[in-house]
Amino acid sequence: MKKKLPLGNSFVERNQIWAAGEIAQANDILQAMDADDIEVVRFVFADQHGLTRGKTILKSAVAATLVNGCTITSTLILKDTSHRTVLPIWQAGAGLGTQRLAGAADLIMVADPSTFKRLPWAQGTGWILCDLYYPDGEPVGYSTRSVLRGALDKLNTRGLDLVSGLEIEFHLFRPIEKSLSAHDCTQPGTPLLASPLQRGYQYLTEIRYDELEPIFAEIRRALLKLELPLRSEELEFGPSQLEITFGPEAGMATADTAILARSAIKQVSRRLGYHATFMCRPHIPNTFASGWHLHQSLVDLKTGKNQMLPDNGDEALSELGQGYLSGLLKHAAAACLL
């Protein structure tokens, strides 16, 4: 007998968060957990810095968590990159002019059933990406997926959708063994001591790629088992600098791919005894800055036709494409903070 979600008077039902498609996908998750011997599911969300945070839920509680969400403290969206809460949560308005985040109030993670995966490197472990809601069912405006969804909804009202392709550069280091002491447990903690895996500055050379192929292979297998649209793996310019690229995806899918891919690469690398970092420029001599590239186009929502292509050969972009590019240039300085 197939298991069914306990939807009656649940959080997602009361607040009409899921449509029929999401309900069907969530029911499929319950069946997949039995078929794949999944023992736990990591319910996570992406914070303002792209870090995944959340809770690991045992199989017996997954069905209830899917429909009622999982509570977390609101301070998790108010932290800097050292994991310090940077806003005065014990003051009226919590520094943001809203009592909803004051006093470290609860937020609720609600899973997006379409994002469910089985983590190939962690035995019996599922993974699902969540959106954030207030206890009254209103979406949290500071939630990264809510921000993107709002922008995509505006685009869709114009009959358009975003198609984007992602390239990510990162460094892979070998940690230098050092006994962890209480003096390292500061906030932020002392930085990891690490050494490069190769000399670098031999961009796209096959021999240098082959030196890292055993590591690339494990990363590649993990990403493909996660059904991510991996397209290429490359040796970048600097020492121990790598790059991966993905095929184009529509809407929010590219952002979800970026979150899962980065987390997967870090976890797989750590289990192999290496340290992967996506920071722009590690404070290690002779390292070369990493970046990421987002290839973008606007397409017709119904036909999928690229609306940024010009009607004739006199222009590089259509009028819509030129306007879109102008907006990117106008907001480029602010976007650098991302």
Give residue ranges: language-model regions.
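ATP/Mg2+-dependent ligation/transfer catalytic cores
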Residues: 1-232, 254
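Positions that flank functional sites
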Residues: 48, 238, 284
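Flexible, glycine/charged-enriched surface loops at secondary-structure junctions
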Residues: 158-167, 229-234, 273-281, 335-338
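Short, conserved phosphate-binding/catalytic loop or strand-edge motifs used
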Residues: 168, 236-244
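Loop-rich catalytic cores of soluble enzymes, especially ATP-dependent carboxylate-amine ligases
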Residues: 243-253, 261, 266, 270-338
